[in-house]
Amino acid sequence: MNPLAQPIIYPTIFTGTLITALSSHWFFAWLGLEMNMLAFIPVLTKKTSPRSTEAAIKYFLTQATASMILLMAILYNNMLSGQWTTTNTTNPYSSLMIVTALAMKLGMAPFHFWVPEVTQGVPLTSGLLLLTWQKLAPISIMYQMSSSVDTNILLTLSILSILVGGWGGLNQTQLRKILAYSSITHMGWMMAVLPYNPDITILNLIIYIILTTTAFLILDLNSSVTILMLTRTWNKLTWLMPLIPSTLLSLGGLPPLTGFLPKWAIIEEFAKNGNLITPTIMAIITLLNLYFYVRLIYATSITLLPMSNNAKMKWQFENTKPTPLLPTLTILTTLLLPISPLILSIS
């Protein structure tokens, strides 16, 4: 990507997300999504290669299809009700089409196929933006129309996303694909609680962004994209070794780490509404995610693979990239659970 284009592209992405998040008019919400999508495509092709070009095309085709479905649903809803406000979506068919379009944009199952492939084909920084920032605009629309969404449809999509996210990540060796499937699982948890308490969805989104950003910063600092490359962290960046297990376990939702907080809040919210079967199923399926994270920790931090003498610990370490955010994010990734009563009272 041309460096001269960056001062235009990144503000456009930010502006598009902001327009969608702050708009209560369907046309401006759709316009913000389009600005965001078109400006994000050059970010995916930041490092020109056939793989990144393929990823950008897949992203564009999926997002364009979702945008067409969304626009058709908006026009259909306006034809029936005469309203353009995002909170007034009472027709079940238009609501179903809107949820389908936004699920495609979020990468929820069964519209998830593009997420692992696009994440795998782009650099780590672009993958981080894809799995974090690009979720904000669609979730903001879902938040505004949470009272008019069919609960059964959302729960079906959520359980399916959690299942696909856990099942799909089991046989992966590429770290970007593992984080992509983890993102699908987290989207399932967020959307499951949306009809009951949208504020917990926002809390889950914030914690998810913190955890995913920490994981991507560690991988970028270590220049690791596969499990094998991550196993060599001990002889390059020894000080990074304690951070890897804590971050991965928190992503898997293991107590008493921060990643358990949103799951705890969601299960509690379901229990308040008299629904115990759904969170039980979701929690059991999420063990698949925890399993492949524990397996990843076992390969990187507990076992030491046979290596030649050239791979022994270096007497002089390489200069590392400056990471001013990593210490703060690591603390937030591991130590937020003790103050969870305060966080839940605010939300």
Swiss-Prot record:
EC number(s) recorded for this UniProt protein: 7.1.1.2
Subcellular location: Mitochondrion inner membrane
TM segment ranges: 13-33, 55-75, 96-116, 122-142, 151-171, 178-198, 199-219, 237-257, 274-294, 326-346
Alphabetical keyword list: Electron transport, Membrane, Mitochondrion, Mitochondrion inner membrane, NAD, Respiratory chain, Translocase, Transmembrane, Transmembrane helix, Transport, Ubiquinone
Catalytic activity: a ubiquinone + NADH + 5 H(+)(in) = a ubiquinol + NAD(+) + 4 H(+)(out)
Classification via InterPro entries: Complex_I_Subunit_2 (IPR050175), NADH_DH_su2_C (IPR010933), NADH_UbQ_OxRdtase_chain2 (IPR003917), ND/Mrp_TM (IPR001750)
Gene Ontology MF term list: NADH dehydrogenase (ubiquinone) activity
Keyword Membrane among UniProt keywords: yes
Pfam families: NADH_dehy_S2_C, Proton_antipo_M
GO biological-process terms attached to the record: mitochondrial electron transport, NADH to ubiquinone; mitochondrial respiratory chain complex I assembly; reactive oxygen species metabolic process
Enzyme's top EC category: translocase
Superkingdom of source: Eukaryota
Main localization (coarse): mitochondrion
Statement: the UniProt record of this protein carries the keyword Disulfide bond: no
Bilayer topology annotation: Multi-pass membrane protein
GO-annotated cellular components: mitochondrial inner membrane; respiratory chain complex I
Role description: Core subunit of the mitochondrial membrane respiratory chain NADH dehydrogenase (Complex I) which catalyzes electron transfer from NADH through the respiratory chain, using ubiquinone as an electron acceptor. Essential for the catalytic activity and assembly of complex I.
Quaternary structure annotation from Swiss-Prot or TrEMBL: Core subunit of respiratory chain NADH dehydrogenase (Complex I) which is composed of 45 different subunits. Interacts with TMEM242.
Family per similarity comment: Belongs to the complex I subunit 2 family.
Protein name as annotated: NADH-ubiquinone oxidoreductase chain 2
